[in-house]
Amino acid sequence: LANRANILNLTRNTQFDMKIERPTHSAVAMATLLLLAAAPRLSAAPGRPGPPTRDPHTPGYVTATELPDGTNAPADQDGNFILGPTHLRAPEMTAQPGVPQGKVYDFVLSSSNSTIYPGIARDPGTFGTPDPADPAKLLVPTSHPHPYTRHLAVYVPAQYTPGTPAPFIVGADGPDHGLFTALDNLIAEHKVPAMVAISIGNGSGDAQGSERGLEYDTMSGRYAEFVETEILPLVEQQCHVTLTKDPDARATMGGSSGGSCALIMAWYHNDLYHRVLTYSGTYVNQQWPSNPETPHGAWEFHEHLIPDSPVKPIRLWLEVGDRDNYNPNVMRDNLHDWVVANENMAKVLAAKGYHYQFVFARNAGHTDRAVKQQTLPEALEWLWKDYQPAAK
């Protein structure tokens, strides 16, 4: 037991502040409480009604296959699917007896060690106001430099052979220990490759003017470059793994703005990532500061970028809930409807001939926990279905 993860090793003069192997249940619980405290609230603001419930058969929405209640889309099929209203937890989301468990390393990183993201924050209780000259642009004068810490959790599968290049998946808004459990089971069932999972916490806050918003909603290669230059070298050094350089063996995932971030990484650095998995992806106008090249933020993906660009080697799984976010901020630019945004994504992906699977979930809110517990194993299996390891 002396080697278990309840031993805390404090380190100095490194890129990180803390390293733990196999966090104890109490440590995981504390981290969960901290993350919940920092996470954006999903309830409607006082005086504002909650989002409407959408019918997946609304005229103008994509044609989709209605699945039997409680079942998932087939892991070997592309296209559009409707599931729910019952969401049954997939067995792979629970640790199974006899299944080898990967090793998990936890770190706490400081903004003082980042050259790409030194840190910003918005003053508490403030948000922003629409630009009088452009309702699609938000002015946030209360955003300013501010330090942060972020959590990083790295899962190394029990089946990893030291020295060999490992496939991996990068996740936003980490740590996501449910992902690690799912991988334990899926790897043991030979449904996905033995991959490393790198679950990166955000730099705090939410939406325009925050560190999280800057990282996840900016339409550029900046976040992928942060991961490539500041996170992956640390993972290789401290977790004793070799990470593949093959973009077809690299995936990204996330929910909400973390979902749009996942696609942004693969779109702007398609040389690094080919596989993307998103829940309630924020394919809306959330970018700040505004960029004249992409004035509508991630709404540009389905408005211009995907329709007007050559097809990229991206395989994309995406989900949205029937009660997903609908214009939750002060902007009234008609570019903040999560359901319409994800429906539009499915349309343009189909029109361009992408490999994609779109899930419309009934009885589901924004980044719905029950939906994720039902669908994540199938989504991961679909995401890696065509993966072929590079020839040695």
Give a label for each model feature.
Residues Y61, P68-K392:
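Non-catalytic cap/lid and distal C-terminal segments of serine-dependent acyl enzymes
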Residues L42-P46:
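Boundary at the C-terminal end of the N-terminal hydrophobic targeting segment
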Residues P49-E66, A90:
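Short acidic, Pro/Gly- and aromatic-enriched capping/linker segments at domain boundaries
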Residues R12, D17-M30:
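Bacterial N-terminal signal peptides that target proteins for export
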Residues A29-R41:
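Bacterial N-terminal signal peptides
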Residues G47-G50, A390-K392:
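Low-complexity, Pro/Thr/Ser/Gly/Ala-rich linker/spacer regions in secreted
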Residues R4, L8-L10:
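Short hydrophobic targeting helices and cationic amphipathic motifs
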